[in-house]
Regions:
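Rossmann-like NAD(P)-binding element
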Residues: 40, 55-116
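Short glycine/serine/threonine-rich phosphate/pyrophosphate-binding segments
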Residues: 17-19, 99, 121-126
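Rossmann-fold dinucleotide-binding core
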Residues: 115-186, 191-194
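NAD(P)-dependent Rossmann-like dehydrogenase/reductase catalytic/cofactor-binding core
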Residues: 2-4, 13, 27-29, 166-169, ...
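NAD(P)+-binding Rossmann beta1-loop-alpha1 motif at the extreme N-terminus of oxidoreductases
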Residues: 1-54, 58
């Protein structure tokens, strides 16, 4: 791709998508934030406004900086707004069919020279790139942010089978502009971080379901004994138990083995609609304030 990335189209205004939109707007990019339902897109922009307001109240941003950042973000329910994008970032539900369906539509809308970046946390990039025309695949890349996006300084960059050097360098440059540290992963399920993290979470859940320790003691063991900032069960609640389950299923399907298999307790919690902080109940119970910040 030639030229700088100035216009960014973000598909998905949830926990990850609105954070991705915010950080790009903060460095001067023009951002279109898409959801099929305009109210959901506007809700994503409202969450960004609330985030910026907190930063102003804490002295991290001036009022002018916050207002200017928010003004660069336009919510939309029109996928056709991707027609002038330099970069399209997908941050929708972690399911192959959902993601490929969206990419297939965007492939017919976005400019031929636009970069396509997926925020998938586990699905192999080459499987997603199959949804677009072969000519587009050199500009298809994995760009995995971490939550909360404005705070977490890491981006996992994943090169697909056909991803070009020029695309990798363009995203590296953008990540640097965003103030993020880049790690580069091979195109295997789970990449680096979740390949390490999910077996740890799964084994912690198995220890819980087998009565080896309470949730509090398992988490304290990790925080105090392993010097982790959060215990594994509270971290799973923070990520979202449905998200954890989806990633484990991708890993189990793509790699296999007991270490990647979702524990029964996780399956049961998700089936009951107890998804962690965002629903108020997971391995722990959360107040309404935690629920409000989870989506």
């Amino acid at each position: 791709m030639e030229g700088a990335i100035e216009r960014v189209f973000v598909a998905g205004a949830g926990l990850m998508g609105h954070g991705i939109a915010q950080v790009h707007a903060a460095i001067g990019r023009t951002v279109t934030l898409f959801e099929p339902d305009l109210e959901r897109a506007e809700a994503g922009r409202d969450r960004i406004a609330a985030n910026l307001e907190r930063s102003v109240s804490k002295g991290r941003l001036t009022r002018e900086e916050a207002d200017t950042t928010l003004a660069r973000i336009e919510p939309t329910a029109d996928l056709g707004r991707a027609a002038d994008a330099d970069l399209a970032i997908e941050a929708v539900f972690e399911e192959l069919a959902v993601k490929t369906g969206l990419w297939r539509q965007l492939d017919g809308i976005a400019p031929a020279e636009a970069i396509f970046a997926t925020n998938t946390s586990s699905i192999a990039i080459h499987r997603l790139a199959e949804a677009v025309d072969e000519a587009r695949r050199p500009r298809f890349v994995g760009m995995h942010f971490f939550s909360p996006v404005p705070v977490m300084p890491l981006i996992e960059l994943i090169r697909g089978r056909d991803t070009s050097d020029a695309t990798i360098e363009a995203i590296r440059t953008l990540a640097s502009d965003l103030g993020k540290h880049v790690i580069v992963s091979g195109d295997k399920p789970g990449f680096i971080v979740n390949r390490i993290l999910m077996p740890f979470l799964a084994e912690s859940m198995r220890a819980y379901e087998q009565g080896i320790g309470t949730a509090e003691d398992i988490d304290a063991g990790a925080r105090i004994g392993l010097n982790h900032p959060m215990g594994p069960l509270e971290l799973a609640d923070f990520i979202g138990l449905d998200v954890c389950l989806g990633i484990m299923r991708v890993l189990d399907d793509g790699i296999g083995g007991e270490r990647f298999r979702a524990p029964r307790v996780l399956e049961e919690l998700v089936a009951a609609g107890n998804l962690g902080q965002k629903t108020g109940q997971g391995f722990y119970t959360y107040p309404r304030t935690a629920q409000a910040s989870g989506g």
